[in-house]
Amino acid sequence: MSKYPYRKDRDELKELLQQYDNLKAGRSHSFIEEDSFEKIIDYFDEKDEIAQALEVTDYAISQYPYSSALLLKKADLLIASKKYKQALYFLEEAELLDTTDIDLYILKTDAYLA
């Protein structure tokens, strides 16, 4: 068993962040997968860097416009930013793509009750 089991995850995240920075700056024509974007968004969200997380989410949605998971992340971040009407817009878009995700209805409730 590895002495540092989380080192691989940290190294992977560091590489993803570098890849995103290069892509954003136009220095790379690399491809970032949808789940990798989700990891980057979660990283900024956990650090309470909501503006940065929203920026990554916008870029990710431009690459994956039919991803209900990314639309839900965007709505969640908007709710955290107290932008409830915008959040509801993205929740409605996500609902068109996936009506079975329970997080959709939890976030809708949060937005309406706020």
Residue ranges of predicted features:
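Structural register within alpha-helical repeat arrays
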Residues: K39-I40, K74, K108
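Residue at a conserved register position within TPR or TPR-like alpha-solenoid repeats
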Residues: Y43-F44, L78, Y112
